[in-house]
């Protein structure tokens, strides 16, 4: 007579199902953690569900650091802490931890311990699995959640194509720049020259009312005169200080105008595109794809006097005569000699803003 087959499972990941188990997830986890095994436990996930007959069931995924050769079919038995009852599971080696994890997630009443170990395998296999992974990523609530899904379900793509995946998810989960809230109303700037007020009335407005080619403005003046705070109080805008970042995280194509603050005109990229309110232009990035700029909005250039800041001095350089002739047709130039506000109408301009810009 053939000997009965001995129980033995040699696996790194185990899938346990406890039918009619009244233990809570926390009680089950506490007992599992007390089990002595030759290899360390890395991750445990427990799901509690109620079947149609109302009986509670527990499903568990256990991941070990190395393979665990289990020869005792009672090894994972659990006991009730309040009554004389044992709970015996169905024990299987988990061919795909990702599939088991997804399966026991279905009811939502779960408890996790440790860090999930990605195995990169799926019982479903093939192209369908890759499609499922990316579909799940698209349906995730955020970029970080989508990256976690791809890392778990498509680890090869995650490693080999991370740059493209990361860039594409920036577009899929594009978050518009947080709107700037000015600490001062534009009306609190009571010393604004008439030519600035007139320029605002003619050029700063939403797309429906805006001129097809608005005129930009260059405002030059000493530090702490309120140029930056005034310029930022006029409406929805893009604020670019020190250097130009046209990424979607910073730059919005729905802004009414741009503010370029404290950028040396000698090194100002896209000088004509900004000053000329040009439409539909591209900006090449060093490590990414070109960025499409909708344009058609005016720009406020803020600067201080001096050879490394003043737009007037820059355009007066002999080599820039042609550019100067173009600039005076596309922008007005205003020099201010006193603050745009009085102390009775607002406190001195915040130091934090001025520390980042000498404008």
Swiss-Prot record:
InterPro entries: CRESS_DNA_REP (IPR049912), Gemini_AL1_CLV (IPR001301), Gemini_AL1_REP (IPR001191), Gemini_AL1_REP_central (IPR022692)
Claim: Hydrolase is one of the keywords in the record: yes
A molecular function (GO) term: DNA binding
Motif, RCR-2: chain positions: 57-59
Ligand binding (a divalent metal cation): 49, 57, 59, 107
UniProt EC number: 2.7.7.-, 3.1.21.-
GO BP term, pick one: DNA replication
Region of interest called Oligomerization, as start-end residue ranges on this chain: 156-176
List of catalytic residues: 103
Domain notes: There are 3 rolling circle replication (RCR) motifs. RCR-2 is probably involved in metal coordination. RCR-3 is required for phosphodiester bond cleavage for initiation of RCR.
Protein name per Swiss-Prot or TrEMBL: Replication-associated protein
Source organism of this protein record: Tomato yellow leaf curl Sardinia virus (isolate Spain-1) (TYLCSV)
Lineage of origin: Viruses, Monodnaviria, Shotokuvirae, Cressdnaviricota, Repensiviricetes
